[in-house]
Regions:
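Thiol/disulfide oxidoreductase modules built on the thioredoxin-like
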Residues: 109-148
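Short amphipathic alpha-helical segments and helix-helix/interface helices
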Residues: 68-73, 91-95, 145
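Short, flexible loop segments at the rims of nucleotide/cofactor-binding pockets, characterized by
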Residues: 30-35, 58-62, 101-103
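Non-globular targeting/processing and membrane-anchoring segments
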Residues: 1-49, 118, 146-148
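Short acidic-hydrophobic, aromatic-tinged amphipathic segments that line or gate anion-handling sites
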Residues: 40-44, 102-111, 136-137
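Short active-site neighborhood of thiol/selenol oxidoreductases, capturing the structured segment around
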Residues: 44-74, 78-83
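Thiol-based oxidoreductase modules, predominantly thioredoxin-like and allied folds used
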Residues: 78-109
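Short acidic, S/G/P-rich loop/turn micro-motifs used as interaction or catalytic elements
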Residues: 59-64, 88-89, 139-141
């Protein structure tokens, strides 16, 4: 009888862990702009970048550093736009230190409050009119739906 009770308690504990993991993942992905809202200053983006994923990044984010190392101009080319939430001078200095990023499409006129971003990196997928159709927390550029 005690054995069955212990097994049930362990099973409930494992179920709780899986449930909390799913809740935390959902909560993390729910940051940022709501889906179906217009992306701010979409008209300022280069015309070739308007349908590509926009990855909101920071120069101090450790996961973002991995994304920068993973970025390859031959593979990703102009298929990704990096939107930095740091000030322009910091971004300029950062790009000088990372030569592989010089050919990347980079914008730095956004701030965290404008995009409702607390944690970076966060990727936005926009439609042709500039509305957010999907968003996701990413740890690799391979997770992005890149148009060929």
């Amino acid at each position: 009888m005690i054995f069955i009770l212990i097994v049930i308690i362990i099973a409930l504990f494992i179920y709780q862990l899986f449930l909390m993991n799913k809740i935390n993942k959902t909560r993390r992905e729910m940051g940022g702009l709501p889906i179906a809202t217009p992306f701010p200053q979409h008209q300022r983006l280069p015309l070739s970048q308007k349908r590509n994923p926009i990855v909101v990044v920071s120069t101090t984010c450790t996961v973002c550093q991995r994304l920068f190392k993973e970025y390859n101009n031959k593979t990703h080319g102009d298929k990704i736009t990096f939107a930095f939430v740091d000030d322009t001078s910091t971004v300029t200095q950062f790009l000088k230190q990372h030569p592989q990023m010089t050919s990347a499409s980079v914008v730095s006129f956004y701030d965290r409050d404008q995009l409702f971003v607390k944690n970076t990196p966060l990727a936005y997928i926009l439609n042709s009119e500039g509305y957010v159709v999907d968003k996701q927390s990413i740890v690799s550029l391979k997770e992005l739906p890149i148009n060929s």
